[in-house]
Amino acid sequence: MERSSRADLISEDSHPARTHTCGDLRAEDNGEAVVLKGWVDTRRDHGGLVFVDLRDRYGLTQVVFSPQDNQTAYEVAGQLRREDVISVQGTVRPRGEEAVNPDLPTGAIEVSADDLAVLNTSETPPFVVSAHEERQMNTNEDLRLAHRYLDLRRPDLQENIELRHRLYQTTHRYFDAHDFLEVETPVLMKSTPEGARDFLVPSRLHPGRFYALPQSPQTYKQLLMVGGLDRYVQIVKCFRDEDLRADRQPEFTQIDVEMTFATEEQVYELTEGLMADLWDTLEDTTLETPFPRMTYDEALRTYGTDKPDLRFDLELHDVSDCFAGSGFRVFDSIVDDGGHIVALRVPGEGDRGRAAMDRLEDHVTDEIGAAGLIYFQLPSDGSGIEQNLSSDALPHEYGRAAAEQVGAEAGDLVLTLAGHSPTVFEQAGALRLHMGEELGLRPPADEGDDAFLWVTDFPLMEYDEEAGRPVSMHHPFTAPHPDDLDRLDEDPTQVQARAYDLVLNGNEIGGGSIRIHNHETQMQVFDVLGIDEEEAQDRFGFLLDALRYGAPPHGGIALGLDRLVMLLAGADSLRDVIAFPKTQSGKEPMVKSPDWVDPEQLETLALRLDLPPDVEPPARIAQRKRLAS
């Protein structure tokens, strides 16, 4: 075995304690005696010398072993491999002028080794771990996650974890300075599913009953306000059993905030202050506050989404009136049925060739899911207008009217989709993002100015066709606008909520609302949602009871900490900013969770598996089950 053949290299660490990290030393440290400890990043044999790049969390230092300084250390250094753990005693000296590395903070110096101790050896890692980006291979993510302890040695991942730590500390200091109390809420709570599924925890002491891991501390933080604690904050783990994607994890962290007697303006001001503090501390950037605001309806109709990316200017336009009386049956039937024709002006793309337009049409139908794309090209030579419909089907004058309404000029392209709200606006919004990325208008996550936006005035409820009833747009504790209370029973989807989302570069990073603090209003909302009095008392009786005892007005916000770090780091995925994340299938390859448990454990919990026919437990579990029976 590799380990046994190299075991004789390992020695006791007889060196003094580490004097410096591998990122500390500079030219002014010339001549200083130092002790460094870390991992071998690379080893090079050159001109009778051994060069080792020694790495730790703080940086990289070049160490030079010479037979003239210490023959034994030189010979051992020649046997070092990547990821061996060593301790080096030596002296700082300047590098030769031709050897200076200006890209490395320690690149002006090297350490001439006087002694070497190998603290542990490493087998050949399954992938390259290196501070040198060019040596980092495109490794399969599942392999990296299966050996996350190695992956965590990569400097870019360590920088993300450090950034996360600094965000934690800045957040704690900010809320402490604003007189907030940090209160821990229970992790084992009652199951009150709303939207996503709960993760359930069976109770051994109460067979047949279950705790749930919190999807958020929503009800608890409201109860803290009823309890008079006035200002609450918690950086808290939350859990949702839902389908995953790049920006979702089954367990995630949020900055949870609640205040009594709060108005929307106070929540905005507090949150903007936190963002300004974070950007100043972590990015050395001054944010302009207050952030711009946009209603939900305006965001949907202008950008096709409730989380618009304002870093580029393409906007949607409702051009339904331009096609009135056109005789084009597709447009006429949709508009007559209350639908919309939505246009997107794309500057400078009026000369696109037929093949490029065919690919765009395919993308609209295959990827975006729209019924079709009607487009109008205004060639840059000013020759008129071209469209992908015959003039018999749709006379050119209607396309020209739409182009004029959206401000198109010679050389521009006008794209139109037809359908019903909100779907057609969402499809047009997806087309906007596609064009922004294809044309390089949308900056990468780690480039360009950040664009914050408050989206306000959400509907309190939306109609769920599958459920056949209204459902909460946010959650059932969101306060309706007082002017709309009389519409709650008759037309709940037209009731405006006192809710708001914070958006950054097209990502929702937080959401909150002013809460219902009146028992009667809360019961009325439950009733509209199809939750009768008995079910409401069973699921939320503790909160309903609390609202009877002088509950103060209150409101707050929850900010996604993982997503904030991801955007600050310019990372592609939440998995790049969490130490031990789950995969997109909800698994953790390193510890192999979720895993089967012994039948005895299930029996203790009064549980029995009823598996689908195509799922069988592994042999080790099946064998134990037979023995137990």
From Swiss-Prot:
The protein's matches in InterPro entries, at most eight in alphabetical order, are given as: Aa-tRNA-synt_II (IPR004364), aa-tRNA-synth_II (IPR006195), aa-tRNA-synth_II/BPL/LPL (IPR045864), Asp-tRNA-ligase_1 (IPR004524), Asp-tRNA-ligase_1_N (IPR047089), Asp/Asn-tRNA-synth_IIb (IPR002312), AspRS_core (IPR047090), GAD-like_sf (IPR004115)
Extract the Pfam families matched here: GAD, tRNA-synt_2, tRNA_anti-codon
Q: Where is this region: Disordered?
A: 1-24
Q: Name one GO cellular component term.
A: cytoplasm
Which one GO biological process term can you cite for this protein? aspartyl-tRNA aminoacylation
Write out the annotated subcellular location: Cytoplasm
Task: Identify the stretch(es) annotated as Aspartate.
Answer: 218-221
Q: Which residues make up the annotated site Important for tRNA non-discrimination?
A: 46
Query: Does the record carry Ligase as a key word?
Result: yes
UniProt-listed Gene3D superfamilies: Bira Bifunctional Protein, Domain 2 (3.30.930.10), GAD-like domain (3.30.1360.30), Nucleic acid-binding proteins (2.40.50.140)
Q: Where does ATP bind?
A: 240-242, 249, 508, 560-563
Please verify whether the record's keywords include Electron transport.
no
Q: Which UniProt keywords apply?
A: Aminoacyl-tRNA synthetase, ATP-binding, Cytoplasm, Ligase, Nucleotide-binding, Protein biosynthesis
UniProt catalytic activity: tRNA(Asx) + L-aspartate + ATP = L-aspartyl-tRNA(Asx) + AMP + diphosphate
Q: What does this protein do?
A: Aspartyl-tRNA synthetase with relaxed tRNA specificity since it is able to aspartylate not only its cognate tRNA(Asp) but also tRNA(Asn). Reaction proceeds in two steps: L-aspartate is first activated by ATP to form Asp-AMP and then transferred to the acceptor end of tRNA(Asp/Asn).
Subunit field text = Homodimer.
Tell me what this protein is called: Aspartate--tRNA(Asp/Asn) ligase
Q: Which organism is it from?
A: Salinibacter ruber (strain DSM 13855 / M31)
Q: Which gene encodes it?
A: aspS
